[in-house]
Amino acid sequence: QAVVTQESALTTSPGETVTLTCRSNTGAVTTSNYANWVQQKPDHLFTGLIGNTNNRAPGVPARFSGSLIGNKAALTITGAQTEDEAIYFCALWYSNRWVFGGGTKLTVLG
C-alpha cells in the first residue's frame, strides 16, 4: 500500500524561500509518479499549482516551482508572500491511482 508523506507544518516569512517535500514509502519519487501539487486556501478553495512534477498550471505565479530533490518531489516557493499561507497537498501516481499526502500547513508570518 503506497503511503505519501509530507511535512505536517512549515513556517516562513515574506520574501523567504521555502521548500515543501513529498515522500513515498515505496522508494524514490520519479517522473513516473507525475507529482501534482494543490493549494487549499482558508476559504477551502482548491487551486492546482503543479502537474507532471514541474509543469506550472496556467496563471500560477512563477514563484511556485516543482522539482525532484533527492528521492522526493518538492514544491519550492521563491519569495513567499502572505497570500501563500495555505495547506499544500501533493499527489503521486501509482500505476492506476492517485495517492495524496496529508498536506503541509504553511504559515507565512506577516
From Swiss-Prot:
CDD domains: IgV_L_lambda. Coiled coil: none annotated. GO terms for cellular component: immunoglobulin complex. It holds the Pfam family V-set. InterPro entries: Ig-like_dom, Ig-like_dom_sf, Ig-like_fold, Ig_sub, Ig_V-set, IgV_Light_Chain. One of its GO terms (biological process) is immune response. It comes from the Eukaryota. This protein was isolated from serum or urine of tumor-bearing mice. This is Ig lambda-1 chain V region S178. It comes from Mus musculus.
